[in-house]
UniProtKB/Swiss-Prot annotation:
Region listing for Important for the catalytic mechanism of both phosphorylation and dephosphorylation, in residue ranges: 205-214
Protein known as: HPr kinase/phosphorylase
Record lineage: Bacteria, Bacillati, Bacillota, Bacilli, Lactobacillales
Record's miscellaneous remark: Both phosphorylation and phosphorolysis are carried out by the same active site and suggest a common mechanism for both reactions.
EC category name: transferase
Species, as recorded: Lactobacillus helveticus (strain DPC 4571)
Family: Belongs to the HPrK/P family.
UniProt function note: Catalyzes the ATP- as well as the pyrophosphate-dependent phosphorylation of a specific serine residue in HPr, a phosphocarrier protein of the phosphoenolpyruvate-dependent sugar phosphotransferase system (PTS). HprK/P also catalyzes the pyrophosphate-producing, inorganic phosphate-dependent dephosphorylation (phosphorolysis) of seryl-phosphorylated HPr (P-Ser-HPr).
Region of interest (Important for the catalytic mechanism of dephosphorylation), ranges: 268-273
The keyword Kinase appears for this protein: yes
Amino acid sequence: MADAVKLSNLIKDNKSILEVYQGHEYIKDDKIYVSDIYRPGLELTGYFDFYPAQRIQLLGRTEISYAARLDHDIRMHVFNKMATKATPCFLISRSLPVPKELSEAAEEADIPILRTGESTTYISSILTEYLRARLAKRTSIHGVLVEIKGMGVLLTGASGVGKSETALGLVQRGHRLIADDRVDAFQKDHNTVVGEAPKILRHLMEVRGIGIIDVMNLFGAGAVKSRTEIQLVINLVNWDPKANYDRLGFEENTCTLCNVPIPQVNIPVKVGRNIESIIEVAAMNFRAKQMGYDATQTFDNNLTSLISEHSKEDTNKEPHND
């Protein structure tokens, strides 16, 4: 988890939608400590009792038009109170004109002013998601994260079980590698966990007998992705002939990542099993269940119906005593 996000990084990573209107010289050392974006409302009326100065202050059409109705002295007073040492920056949406009083107050307090052509709601959503992802608490997981047909699948299992080799086979079949060996996971929202590779391991994979390979250079940019939502965990286990493995799919297991329960499938590994194909089918079957079709439940319903029909036939065939 990062304690703060540099304002310079926020601007660089969102340069297609953000521009520095004023205060380039103040950007280098500014940091953002919270993910929430604030739209000052009551503050424009002079009420500052609960003003969250540490947030990015976003002014849209409503705020700018209301401020324009205020007298010059009141506007100056309000913007001076909003421009505190804790304020990372002001952001003006829709490429609206920056009030002169805000420009002066920001200059006096060494606060940069940013501007965007995007709508207020859209830019708030984009920056909030960006900040949440970078300020979120991260958990390191030993495993391999791949994306199969748009679904994030985390491969786990004991060292040497073949996670990396399996992931390499999946990449050769057209799927994407996110992270090998170590996955950094964080909770995006209440029900969503996102995984990514540490910067130093991005696009790299360790294959026993070969060493380190660069997946993007070998297979192209379409074979990798920076991050993805973890929707399914597939745990690879060494085949045990004495174990009683689930053959019908009635068992529904979960594991907990970042306090979020994630569905888990245990797949036994042994020589001769095409693990890549099995994992592909497991991912597609999971998606089918999400869409409302459960082959196991359908089989169970059909079997129950068949047993019921045979029971009725047997009852009808029983001899009657006169």
